[in-house]
Amino acid sequence: YVNTYGRIFYSSDLGGVTFINSASGFEVRFRGTELVAEVQTLSGGTKYPNGMFSVFVDGETDSNARILKTEASGGLRDKITIVSGLNEGEHTVKVLKRTPSNRDRLIVSEISTDGELLTAPAKPSVDIEFYGDSITCGEGVLREYKDENGNIVDSALYTQETQNVFQSYAGECAKNLGAAFRVFGRGGIALKYRKAGDPYTVSNNYESVAVDLPNSDYPYDYNSYRPSVVVVYLGTNDYLLYSKHGSTVVDDDGNRYSSGGLTVAVVNFVKDVIGQKYGYDMPVILCSNLMVPNAGLDKVMTNAAAQLTEFECVRAVGFKKGVTADKGGHPVVEDSIVAGKRLSDEIKSVLGL
């Protein structure tokens, strides 16, 4: 009766299914006027005190029309109303997480309605898997970035209220295609390089349900899901960590950051993860350039794509730089719309849509 989206896990100790990653969530079809759930919310502290979800009713696509904000529950279960006051009849409701895996998580124990649950609807035929960081997760995408005269100043206001994965380039791309999508990653995560004290990168923890959970305790089953296409937009934090911390930033083997080393890391990740888990017929798109446009990451991705000759289709997409990129800022909605259109056009070409 329930469709789920994204990497999730069930825990009998927690008494429910945990939704932790950006764009993860559930979808139900029911006959009735309201939908309620029994949940627990774990939050990321005072700056991120709530769970934040977009609710889509009967095919709605506006991720800001219905925002569900759940309160941190301190280990207790709360009964929340997801939607109410609907016209009597059949409805489809999708509840998807706006925020990344290091901010909050929702544990759902029960879903009910004042009518009856029906068989879940068919999922979209196109499904995109994204490996990314804050750019993909839409951190700060809704923040103010212009002064009263229209000059770009960038407020750099990164809170749960200014995050929305559905208005990142990934979300805009999926909306253009009518596709489902999932995200593995979160703000600040790197592909390969890390500073002392940071245990995880995407490369060393991709077999976990979420990038900050140990894969020994939270293993992910790659056989449970097969996307239509895989998008990798990583490397920004590898470069930024190196820029800030210099030679203390190394990979798991102690090698210092270099653009050549990052190229090798991209090639190895695509081969060892996407190729081995899904096969070399899986289309792969490597993205760059919304942030730090002078870092040479577009060249890294282009060079990596050229080396991945085992695959039937690997393309590199360098986006137009974001409007706040020269001030070190994250992409905003206008950037996401342009980049999302660029990527969705590329996916249409790749998949023959």
Task: Pin down the residues of each PLM region.
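N-terminal secretory targeting modules
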Residues: 1-131, 135-165, 353
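Conserved SGNH/GDSL esterase-like catalytic core that processes O-acyl groups on lipids
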Residues: 21-23, 152-255, 292-298, 330
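Surface-exposed acidic, glycine-flexible loop patches that form ligand/cofactor-binding
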Residues: 118-121, 214-226, 274-278, 349-353
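Structural recognition of the beta-strand scaffold that forms the well-ordered cores
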Residues: 127-131, 136, 181-185, 228-233, ...
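Solvent-exposed, polar/charged alpha-helical surfaces in well-ordered, non-transmembrane soluble domains
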Residues: 167, 171, 175, 220, ...
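A structural motif corresponding to the C-terminal end of an alpha-helix
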Residues: 169-180, 269-283, 304-311
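Active-site segments of SGNH/GDSL-like serine hydrolases
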Residues: 233-238, 266-302
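Catalytic His-Asp segment of secreted/periplasmic serine-dependent ester chemistry enzymes
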Residues: 289-353
